[in-house]
Amino acid sequence: VHEEEKPLIPIPEKILSYYKNYVNDMFLEDGVSYETQKEFEIGYDEASDRITVPIRDDLGNLVGVKGRYFYREVPSDIQKFIYLEKCARSQILYGLYKTINYIKQNRRVFVVEAEKGVQQLWSAGYCESVATGGKKITQCQIDKLTRLCVPIIFVFDKDVEQKELEAIADKFIVEVEIYALIDKDNILSEKQSP
């Protein structure tokens, strides 16, 4: 079964009790305040030595947990990200359950690739964002973004080329306003986003 066809199944909240409720300095150095880390329930899994990022659906139900290797330098034999609790990521706009009211209030949505991007924007006072979980965007995510009925601003990593963003924009119906922030002056490093 294709991932988009799998139902999003809520998992028990008690799963989060397996992880330590710790904030971390790496996210802080990357622009995610301790307060924001607590808001998004960032934690730590001792068993896998990973920072934990709970994944919630549009209604706030826990549907997965993503783990990021705890150290900035990742050895070649270790995956940087794994799902400690798997979910149908292609059906998720990370953060939407928390940011929907800000999206409606500010009449726009910033779309980033990674969950941490939503947290960085939140820390900077831009609470109207969601993450796709990567540069590939699914029809399910396109439909959810379209239903927000607000202008959509893509703020993807610098390594995503303008033609890739144009191809994404072409997947939306013509009535949807699509914008993208692109670093044409080479201010950012490859994995940074505007």
Predicted regions located by residue number:
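A short glycine-rich beta-strand->turn/loop micro-motif centered on a GG-aromatic cluster
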Residues: 129-136, 179-187
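TOPRIM metal-binding catalytic domain and adjacent DNA-binding surface shared by DnaG-type primases
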Residues: 1-52, 56-59, 100-103
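Conserved catalytic cores of soluble enzyme domains
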Residues: 135-180
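Phosphate-handling DNA/RNA-contact segment within nucleic-acid enzymes
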Residues: 46-149, 164
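Conserved nucleotide-binding/hydrolysis micro-motifs of P-loop NTPases
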Residues: 159-160, 186-188
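Short, surface-exposed amphipathic charged segments that create phosphate/polyanion-binding patches used
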Residues: 143-148, 188-194
